[in-house]
């Protein structure tokens, strides 16, 4: 039975539990839950904060000027400490992890988007848990995703997750500030993110983490518009991750917009104009339109234009009709060499391969 793919985002407050350093006992409990789900067949991806806090503690809380360079220094030192902490804890359960550091450029550039996605799927397919953070040591304002809430939503899209969990130091989203209003009630379900919901989330900001609620609402908006259910839940609740995975009602659930899933994917992948044309034979046309299959090199007759791996191209029939847009796994020069050939010949011809298909069905949109 195929279990769902879940992205779990841990904020610094969840990992430190209010202390100035990573809280190892709490991280151990987190790892125990994820190990249980991993062994039960769930595909888990971790998006982790905490590098700056780990770096500051490792350097014995140095007095540094409040500059971007200082933060990047702490992130550079702390990232290795953070990943080591995760690695040691997962090793107890004989589970391997793989680290990815991402910036916005890795997601917005189509070839890097494909590479990041392929790496994530390769890790998951080999039962390795990806641990992801924004590359704060080198990211500038222009290439930062912005925060790990937003990053986790983009990662959820990358891996086509069913669910995104945003774990925080709050119980979820309340209808007013519970510290100011004793009558404040937890909102268990949000059908749609409206201006009212945004105003609730942005209504207050404190060192307890409520100020970060707006970024979580923005992340939930991005994810749910891509068909990914999102839950804001308390990271310190016992067994919270496992309970969420097995459908217990905890925190605030944001309902996924299933009808928007395809349209958001069109916008995400195919906003740019096409860079070339791949002409296919009748067999490939039938496989794509009637059997919902990927495009194999054997079905390619001609390649027009110069394009890179991951750029958008048109798929055209022998009669001249454009039937699809898609992102090829190979650039135009490589496709010229492998067109009409069997997939088994790819590595012999090119000296490498990105897989047996020229264009995967997941990277293709059929034109009506």
Swiss-Prot record:
Pathway: Amino-acid biosynthesis; L-proline biosynthesis; L-glutamate 5-semialdehyde from L-glutamate: step 1/2. The keyword Transcription regulation does not apply. InterPro entries: AceGlu_kinase-like_sf (IPR036393), Asp/Glu/Uridylate_kinase (IPR001048), G5K_ProB (IPR041739), Glu/AcGlu_kinase (IPR001057), Glu_5kinase (IPR011529), Glu_5kinase/COase_Synthase (IPR005715), Glutamate_5-kinase_CS (IPR019797), PUA (IPR002478). Signal peptide: none annotated. It is found in: Cytoplasm. Residues 275-353 form the PUA domain. Its EC number is 2.7.2.11. It comes from the Bacteria. One of its GO terms (biological process) is L-proline biosynthetic process. ATP binds at residues 9, 168-169, 210-216. Keywords: Amino-acid biosynthesis, ATP-binding, Cytoplasm, Kinase, Nucleotide-binding, Proline biosynthesis, Transferase. Coiled coil: none annotated. It is an enzyme of class 2 (transferase). SMART domains: PUA (SM00359). It catalyses: L-glutamate + ATP = L-glutamyl 5-phosphate + ADP. Belongs to the glutamate 5-kinase family. Catalyzes the transfer of a phosphate group to glutamate to form L-glutamate 5-phosphate. This is Glutamate 5-kinase. It comes from Haemophilus influenzae (strain PittGG). The gene is proB.
């Amino acid at each position: 039975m195929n279990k769902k793919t879940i992205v779990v985002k841990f904020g610094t407050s969840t990992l430190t539990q209010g202390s100035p350093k990573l809280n190892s006992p709490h991280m151990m409990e987190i790892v125990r839950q994820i190990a249980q789900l991993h062994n039960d067949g769930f595909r888990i991806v971790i998006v982790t904060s905490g590098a700056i806090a780990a770096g500051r503690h490792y350097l014995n809380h140095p007095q540094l000027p409040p500059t971007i360079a200082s933060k990047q220094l702490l992130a550079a030192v702390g990232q290795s400490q953070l990943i080591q902490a995760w690695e040691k804890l997962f090793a107890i359960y004989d589970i391997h992890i793989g680290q990815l550091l991402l910036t916005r450029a890795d997601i917005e550039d189509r070839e890097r988007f494909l590479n990041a996605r392929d790496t994530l799927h390769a890790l998951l397919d080999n039962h390795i848990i990806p641990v992801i953070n924004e590359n704060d040591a080198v990211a500038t304002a222009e290439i930062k995703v912005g925060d790990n809430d937003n990053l986790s939503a983009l990662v959820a899209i990358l891996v086509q997750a069913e669910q995104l969990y945003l774990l925080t130091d709050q119980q979820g989203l309340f209808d007013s500030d519970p510290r100011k209003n004793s009558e404040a009630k937890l909102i268990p379900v949000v059908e749609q993110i409206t201006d009212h919901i945004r105003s609730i989330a942005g209504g207050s900001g404190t060192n307890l983490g409520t100020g970060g609620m707006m970024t979580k609402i923005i992340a939930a908006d991005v994810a749910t518009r891509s068909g990914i259910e999102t839950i804001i839940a308390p990271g310190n609740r016992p067994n919270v991750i496992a309970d969420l995975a097995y459908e217990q009602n905890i925190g605030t659930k944001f309902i996924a917009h299933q009808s928007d899933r395809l349209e958001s994917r069109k916008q995400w992948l195919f906003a740019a104009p096409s860079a070339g044309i791949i002409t296919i034979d009748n067999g490939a046309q039938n496989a794509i339109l009637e059997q919902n299959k990927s495009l194999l090199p054997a079905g390619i007759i001609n390649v027009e234009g110069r394009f890179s791996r991951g750029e958008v191209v048109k798929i055209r029939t022998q009669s001249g009709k454009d039937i699809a847009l898609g992102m090829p796994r190979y650039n135009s020069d490589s496709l010229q060499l492998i067109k009409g050939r069997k997939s088994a010949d790819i590595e012999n011809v090119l000296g490498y391969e990105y897989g047996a298909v020229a264009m995967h069905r997941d990277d293709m949109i059929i034109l009506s």
